[in-house]
Amino acid sequence: MHALSGFSLVSLLSLGYLSWDWAKPGLVADGPAEAEDQPSAAPPQPPHIIFILTDDQGYHDVGYHGSDIETPTLDRLAAEGVKLENYYIQPICTPSRSQLLTGRYQIHTGLQHSIIRPRQPNCLPLDQVTLPQKLQEAGYSTHMVGKWHLGFYRKECLPTRRGFDTFLGSLTGNVDYYTYDNCDGPGVCGFDLHEGESVAWGLSGQYSTMLYAQRASHILASHSPQKPLFLYVAFQAVHTPLQSPREYLYRYRTMGNVARRKYAAMVTCMDEAVRNITWALKRYGFYNNSVIIFSSDNGGQTFSGGSNWPLRGRKGTYWEGGVRGLGFVHSPLLKKKRRTSRALVHITDWYPTLVGLAGGTTSAADGLDGYDVWPAISEGRASPRTEILHNIDPLYNHARHGSLEGGFGIWNTAVQAAIRVGEWKLLTGDPGYGDWIPPQTLASFPGSWWNLERMASIRQAVWLFNISADPYEREDLADQRPDVVRTLLARLADYNRTAIPVRYPAANPRAHPDFNGGAWGPWASDEDEEEEDEEEEGRARSFPRGRRKKKCKICKLRSFFRKLNTRLMSHRI
């Protein structure tokens, strides 16, 4: 005890000498935070796949990008693996998750607009074969821990019906980290933590980052390394609300900005969670035949403590700060390690890449927009991807200065869209707030937040950048290169011809948690689904003679909420 004199428990935690995972009996056995690497041997096939997804982590919010936030585990794993420095995701939650699990752009799943909200009768289309389903076909055990956010209005939409053997996590977009409550408007609140298809009331009170890491470790402890495993860990961190255990806040006590301080503490806690999962992989015999993929889901929300510096924009925008992702691959199976890859990679690419690693196959009939990029990542070959459709959102067409004439008669530039072809990036419509927010503006709150470098022109609806030469999007070349603008507008039009209609239904009052025992969960039946389909068809064409819509109070409420969605909810993320 004398050796510890002058030190407090908090100071030990702040220095990283204690770990909440293996410090608790029965979760992970006592031992060092990093186990020794196991002797190399010819790995069996196929490999174990661990996909770790973080929520709202900014491009600048990792140590190896020069952040003031401590992420020693992520820094080490990235340094020993392959850093993906030309990696793209989507600007908000649902689209990134849908593209990860389907390998398809939003325009091919009907999820082009916004996110799936708790009261919407909507989910990842049931006709889509998901990544975990393909891995199950290849003989994998599949497990998910964390945030789903792909819809749940019917039981068929739940993770355990979409390819996962087990699930522990939340179904909605953001919950309290301790109580797991989530509100979708004033007075519309419910509990959202689920174990399989049941509400996990008994787990309330445990900080979600720790709970999810502990569950991941339990899965590894109870699973045989001889059977291939797919473990998808979708942390809630570091999405709002900004909540962190006190011991992590203490580490950043000198940060002047309260939001940044809480955010930094959450990132470091998440980093330690990744450390504990990695340690469990080594302890239970998975590591030598494993592939660990780390990815953010969208850009950081700068007004909630995140930073995307030196990139332009933030979460919810199509500037680089909204769509450039944090990503790396760590694996003993990599042929060329300890390097940075500039190969163009998009989140849709993980579907065919991981199916290929698993020994499965994909074909043109699958309609995938992703590519198998494993040779580019593992061996340093050229990426098969040369372009990315960031999105086309036909419902978001409010740019005042956009028009079909402004798009050379090829494209209505009022429509929000963004595309990358080779080194060129084109944006139309309203891409979102395009500020550059350097880290020094985060020193205090709220005054210095507004001391930003604002984008110079707002009276336009077309932007063109050479991303290879200008990754920070400072020099708009649209006026200088109308030939390139025409080419990319035509490419947008080509993509748009393959798009399916947007599915963004109005909120359904029956989804209220009060009708489901106080918890968010499935509420619709097959009859409800038929009625929804009937309403969708009715908006596109007149009903045939002799067929009449049901008259009901709920239908009138749906009409009201649909109008409300159009005016207000389309602007929220």
Swiss-Prot record:
<feature type="active site">
    <location>
        <position position="149"/>
    </location>
</feature>
<keyword id="KW-0256">Endoplasmic reticulum</keyword>
<feature type="glycosylation site" description="N-linked (GlcNAc...) asparagine">
    <location>
        <position position="466"/>
    </location>
</feature>
<dbReference type="Pfam" id="PF00884">
    <property type="entry name" value="Sulfatase"/>
</dbReference>
<feature type="compositionally biased region" description="Acidic residues">
    <location>
        <begin position="525"/>
        <end position="537"/>
    </location>
</feature>
<keyword id="KW-0378">Hydrolase</keyword>
<feature type="binding site">
    <location>
        <position position="239"/>
    </location>
    <ligand>
        <name>substrate</name>
    </ligand>
</feature>
<keyword id="KW-0964">Secreted</keyword>
<dbReference type="GO" id="GO:0005783">
    <property type="term" value="C:endoplasmic reticulum"/>
</dbReference>
<feature type="signal peptide">
    <location>
        <begin position="1"/>
        <end position="23"/>
    </location>
</feature>
<dbReference type="GO" id="GO:0046872">
    <property type="term" value="F:metal ion binding"/>
</dbReference>
<comment type="function">
    <text>Displays arylsulfatase activity at neutral pH, when co-expressed with SUMF1; arylsulfatase activity is measured in the secretion medium of retinal cell line, but no activity is recorded when measured in cell extracts.</text>
</comment>
<comment type="similarity">
    <text>Belongs to the sulfatase family.</text>
</comment>
<feature type="binding site">
    <location>
        <position position="56"/>
    </location>
    <ligand>
        <name>Ca(2+)</name>
    </ligand>
</feature>
<feature type="glycosylation site" description="N-linked (GlcNAc...) asparagine">
    <location>
        <position position="496"/>
    </location>
</feature>
<feature type="region of interest" description="Disordered">
    <location>
        <begin position="506"/>
        <end position="550"/>
    </location>
</feature>
<dbReference type="InterPro" id="IPR047115">
    <property type="entry name" value="ARSB"/>
</dbReference>
<keyword id="KW-0325">Glycoprotein</keyword>
<feature type="modified residue" description="3-oxoalanine (Cys)">
    <location>
        <position position="93"/>
    </location>
</feature>
<dbReference type="InterPro" id="IPR017850">
    <property type="entry name" value="Alkaline_phosphatase_core_sf"/>
</dbReference>
<feature type="binding site">
    <location>
        <position position="147"/>
    </location>
    <ligand>
        <name>substrate</name>
    </ligand>
</feature>
<dbReference type="GO" id="GO:0005576">
    <property type="term" value="C:extracellular region"/>
</dbReference>
<feature type="glycosylation site" description="N-linked (GlcNAc...) asparagine">
    <location>
        <position position="288"/>
    </location>
</feature>
<feature type="binding site">
    <location>
        <position position="298"/>
    </location>
    <ligand>
        <name>Ca(2+)</name>
    </ligand>
</feature>
<dbReference type="GO" id="GO:0008484">
    <property type="term" value="F:sulfuric ester hydrolase activity"/>
</dbReference>
<keyword id="KW-0732">Signal</keyword>
<feature type="glycosylation site" description="N-linked (GlcNAc...) asparagine">
    <location>
        <position position="276"/>
    </location>
</feature>
<dbReference type="InterPro" id="IPR024607">
    <property type="entry name" value="Sulfatase_CS"/>
</dbReference>
<feature type="binding site">
    <location>
        <position position="315"/>
    </location>
    <ligand>
        <name>substrate</name>
    </ligand>
</feature>
<dbReference type="InterPro" id="IPR000917">
    <property type="entry name" value="Sulfatase_N"/>
</dbReference>
<feature type="binding site">
    <location>
        <position position="297"/>
    </location>
    <ligand>
        <name>Ca(2+)</name>
    </ligand>
</feature>
<feature type="binding site">
    <location>
        <position position="55"/>
    </location>
    <ligand>
        <name>Ca(2+)</name>
    </ligand>
</feature>
<protein>
    <recommendedName>
        <fullName>Arylsulfatase I</fullName>
        <ecNumber>3.1.6.-</ecNumber>
    </recommendedName>
</protein>
<feature type="active site" description="Nucleophile">
    <location>
        <position position="93"/>
    </location>
</feature>
<keyword id="KW-0479">Metal-binding</keyword>
<keyword id="KW-0106">Calcium</keyword>
<feature type="binding site" description="via 3-oxoalanine">
    <location>
        <position position="93"/>
    </location>
    <ligand>
        <name>Ca(2+)</name>
    </ligand>
</feature>
